[in-house]
């Protein structure tokens, strides 16, 4: 097979890592693959720069931009349709909302035999404006009518799409987002890193991994941390991430009286995130919008329980009372009590962590994801040939 994976930008992020591993799996299975993206610039850093001999072709075009730009997007559709037609791909696989809309339209215009799309997170939801929701829902309905298969990294988003009348039930297939789990499964606490971050040896650690940006949950995390700090004087809070709201969050911790208990580690490279998570006892994730939080999978791979909100795909990996606890969004008291319970009961903490580790080891290996996609491509192409 000859497959084109298309995403608007290859910054360091979950959807991008998924795309990279999907392409890598194709090449390792003996197929031909091109990864097509727009300019991969951002505070997060470029994933393309981290790729070492990926084994597949990579192409960037300035026409592919993340923001809605009608004139540029129209040019992108026609350019991409012409390119796909010339290259005679068997499959175009688009990722995320913007590339999904542009790529599916272009793929159908070009007559690509199989047009598929992966939902990593929805561009509409209860925390977005009515106008934005209507715009994206209509665009997603239009694009869904121009593709053969829609993959989702969580069942929750399939349900949300069908409720919004996007696509048909038979179009959807859940394929959990595979990851390179080995470094998380094997991670051990590093005393030198702990010392470098200024975390005393006898302190327990609550971790958070997310960009310092609204809706990533820090508006809830820090007030919750203040409650936990009062109950557990030896606890520190390790923040793994950076972003435009850092100064505001640092000020918030000062106002809450916990600035000396919070370590802002800054942007941690994907190659080292396992080392940092290994220093924690529990991970909190209070994002209001997340497809399926990769940080929850990564934390559980290290047997660290997770406390999170039951939004989007989170309950599919954070099983309440089994691999962590789910608490009502915005309920600081419930979140604090869940964290305190995990911190104060080491036997329960170990049990939650080990259950989660077993869960993600089975569901989230990247090779399992890749093999599932390839088998589905082949089955869909075979079914289309019979028609």
Question: Model-found features: residue ranges?
Answer:
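Short alpha-helical donor nucleotide-sugar binding micro-motif in glycosyltransferases
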Residues: 84, 267-268, 275-280
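N-terminal strand-loop element at the rim of the active site
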Residues: 5-72
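Short hydrophobic beta-strand element within catalytic cores of glycosyltransferases
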Residues: 305-308, 318
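A short, active-site helix/loop in glycosyltransferases that binds the activated sugar's phosphate group
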Residues: 146-174, 179-183
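Conserved acidic donor-binding segment of nucleotide-sugar-dependent glycosyltransferases
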Residues: 320-321, 325-332, 341-346
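A conserved mid-protein helix/loop that constitutes part of the nucleotide-sugar donor-binding site
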Residues: 16-24, 204, 208-230, 244-251, ...
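A short, well-ordered alpha-helix in the C-terminal region of glycosyltransferases
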Residues: 107, 334, 341, 348-363, ...
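Aromatic "clamp/platform" in nucleotide-sugar-dependent glycosyltransferases that forms part
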Residues: 288
């Amino acid at each position: 097979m000859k497959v084109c994976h298309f995403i608007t930008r290859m910054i360091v992020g979950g959807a991008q890592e998924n795309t990279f591993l999907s392409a890598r799996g194709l090449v390792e299975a003996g197929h031909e693959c091109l990864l097509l993206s727009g300019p991969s610039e951002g505070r997060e850093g470029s994933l393309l720069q981290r790729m070492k001999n990926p084994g597949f072709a990579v192409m960037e075009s300035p026409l592919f931009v993340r923001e809605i730009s009608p004139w540029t997007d129209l040019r992108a559709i026609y350019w991409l349709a012409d390119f796909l037609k010339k290259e005679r791909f068997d499959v175009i696989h688009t990722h995320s909302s913007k590339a999904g809309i542009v790529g599916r339209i272009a793929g159908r215009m070009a007559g690509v035999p199989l047009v598929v799309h992966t939902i990593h997170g929805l561009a509409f939801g209860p925390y977005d404006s009515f106008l934005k929701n209507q715009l994206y829902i209509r665009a997603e309905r239009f694009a869904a009518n121009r593709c053969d298969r829609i993959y989702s990294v969580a069942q929750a988003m399939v349900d949300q799409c069908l409720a919004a009348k996007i696509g048909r039930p038979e179009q959807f297939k859940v394929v959990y987002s595979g990851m390179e789990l080995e470094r998380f499964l094997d991670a051990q606490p590093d005393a030198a890193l702990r010392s470098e971050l200024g975390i005393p040896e006898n302190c327990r650690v609550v971790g958070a991994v997310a960009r310092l940006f609204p809706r990533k949950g820090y508006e809830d995390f820090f007030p919750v941390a203040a409650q936990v700090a009062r109950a557990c004087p030896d606890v520190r809070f390790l923040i793994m991430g950076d972003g435009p709201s850092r100064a505001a969050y640092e000020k918030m911790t000062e106002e809450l009286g916990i600035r000396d208990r919070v370590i802002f580690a800054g942007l941690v490279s994907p190659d080292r995130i396992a080392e940092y998570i290994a220093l924690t006892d529990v991970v909190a994730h209070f994002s209001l919008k997340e497809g399926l939080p990769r940080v929850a999978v990564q934390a559980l791979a290290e047997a660290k329980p997770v406390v999170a909100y039951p939004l989007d795909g989170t309950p599919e990996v954070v099983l309440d009372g089994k691999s962590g606890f789910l608490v009502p969004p915005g309920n600081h008291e419930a979140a604090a009590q869940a964290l305190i319970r995990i911190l104060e009961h080491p036997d329960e903490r170990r049990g939650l962590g080990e259950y989660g580790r077993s869960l993600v080891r089975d569901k989230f290996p990247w090779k399992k994801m890749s093999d599932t996609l390839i088998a589905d491509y082949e089955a869909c192409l075979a079914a289309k040939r019979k028609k």
